[in-house]
Amino acid sequence: MNWYERPVRMMRWEYMQNVSKMKDMDLEQLAKMKKEDWHINCEWFVGAPGVAPGLGFQTTFKAEGFERYPGFENFDSLREYLPYAHKYGIKLLVYLNMHWYSYEFAKKHPDWEQLISSAEPYGKIHPLYGNGTTFCVNSPWRNWAFRLIKETMKTGVDGIFLDGPVVFSDCCYCQYCEEKFKKTYGENLPEKEDWQNFLWKDFIEFRRDSLAEFLRDAQKAMKEINSEGVIFLNAGGWQPSGWRVARDIEKMQDYQDFNGAEEFFHPKAEKSILATSMMAKYLTAGMKPAVVFNHYAMGSWHYIPLMPLEIKLALAQIIANRANPWICVFDPLAKNIGEKEPVAEVLGFAEENEEYYLKTSSLAKVAVHFSRQTSTYYLSQYTSLYKDLGTGKEEGLVLDQGTGKLVVDWERRKSINESLLHHSYIGCYLSLIRSHTLFDIILDKNLTSEKLKEYEVLVLPNSACLSENQRKAIKEFVRKGGKLFASFETGFYDEKGNLLEDKEWKEFLGIEEIEDLFPPMVGENYMTATEEFAGFPKSQLIERPIQTLKVRAKKSTRTPLFYLKPLPKIYMSLQGVSASPALLISKYGKGKVVYSPSLLEAFYGEYRIESTSQLITQIVKMLSLEEIIKMDAPSAVEIEVYEQKDSSRYIIHLINATGDMQRPIKEIIPVRNIKISLKLKQTRKIYHLNNKETIPFVHKKGRIEFVISELKLYEVIIVEK
């Protein structure tokens, strides 16, 4: 097993413009401190700084043909520090800034810059970090970058992290991109964003391919010097807007050794407490080891460490979801809140118990699809989706219902679709985590007959853009006994976002006919249960999602929920039940399909209405066979369970985010007497990993049952079979 396939605990110690101060430090003590106090085993060391005014062209080490960073003229940081890092078991990766360069340096290479569609340099119109520009992966700059990579590897380091390059929005229209696109597609670059233009979609793919090819050639250059070296860049997370900067882990992972993405804390951002967990689970869906990047900082106040419980919670969520943590510490680190202790507590635990994080396999039988195809190419056919609806808030006797005007701008329409998908993923994720449902995230490439054999239930949260082969694999999965839960426009478009006329697919979902979209409106529209279903009694009113299709179900389809007739305004009397079903349940072969004409997941993701989450989770539970694990605990307790087959044991991770209702979190409220039931006929021993205390258990009807007396923030329970 390669070192990077084992649990890795990464750190970057950031000195900003004062990086030269390290030449006066005791380098051995520096390495020892990071290993023994912070418990890392991998360090990012700055080789080409990412500091103002864009000094990525300078190096902190001897590199033939490259300018030295001031203060390093007679000091080779990498060659000096590397022996001490290795002495203390720290793998050394070099940080190379590859996206931010000063205007002065760019003037020496005017044909390297990324150009926007107006033929102006991107950095001129959008100065990077207020001052600086960026270069194109198809320009001769790539050869300059590959030389820097080779010079870096000659120092003997273990690998490289590339901070960039980034293919920025509306880029690139330089001569090299023009020539390459013309050679590849036989046409000139499209002039503007136009999702009805096939060339625009080709341009989107061209940008991603260009970045992937740069990484491929960067990896090749690195391995010419050290065949065992590792290389990776920030390949982007789950967010649907990733196409705007050509990020796609499925494209990049063939040429890198980690799939990494940022999940920084910002005090004003309205992020879920499970944001880091979500990023970790998404990244582990790839084929490569995952790493989640966290600043150990109070948002943009970089020299003040993040509140202790926030950083501990983030690190626990990362390792519990089988990803690797990375923290950036900014020097000098203020001591007014806490220094190394919160980080050392979690990373020290992971270091001490590394064997329990090795070679684990998921026990999840539910798969949730996060579709890069959809996030990139989805543009709904329904124009009423693009009306300004306002927020639905009523304050001071004024109701915000928007202007009702139709958005016609392509860029704005695309943003609306991205927002819907963004909230769909969040809504689906939160619903399942908060209901203690075990699930995996799967990517587009996983929608194959072979991969789907691992699961009982497949959830497609508006996976609108699916290829013919993907649709066939899904139908085969259900025909052989699998269960499907799909919503809204799932499968209505091909993998490039082109509208399909696939009547068989709609019949597969239980649809006889789609009439139109209900008038979108925030508030005062409802669904009702026409039978007892999913915990809702008959005639129960349920909030209707804003985006809802009006469909007719095919014969023999069960329809337990119906929409009420739409109301054009609030404070109006209900008009009775419509003829349009709100949920379609049908059989297909040996399996079952549940289809929601509404964007249920997006509705919960944006509005957090509990009845919607209840509907989502109860449908998934209804489709599942007997649950592998059941837990009686507050919804803010996350559970992840894995099996170590070689050691014949289950690993149960419990993360408690029950806090004081604001972020940054100041207090975690302990949860007591958590009842857990695990589907297992027999077991030898159950114990807490932190103190090895045994936990009493009982056998009952093919399951074992036990109680966790108290959960503070993070606990690992071992079940030996």
Pin down the residues of each PLM region.
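Boundary/entry segment of secreted carbohydrate-active catalytic domains
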Residues: M1-D26
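Glycine-rich, aromatic-flanked loop segments that form ligand/cofactor-binding clefts
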Residues: M10, W38-A48, D76-P127, G159-G164, ...
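Aromatic- and glycine-enriched glycan-recognition loops and surfaces
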Residues: Q17-W38, K62-I90, N143-W144, S210-F214, ...
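Short, acidic/polar
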Residues: V19-E36, S139-T152, S241-M252, T276, ...
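Catalytic domains of carbohydrate-active enzymes, especially glycoside hydrolases
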Residues: M25-G54, T155, D254, F258, ...
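Aromatic- and acidic-residue-enriched segments that line the glycan-binding/catalytic groove
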Residues: L55-G71, M98-L128, D163-D194, W243-E250, ...
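Carbohydrate-binding surfaces of carbohydrate-active enzymes
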Residues: W200-K201, E205-W243, M252-K721
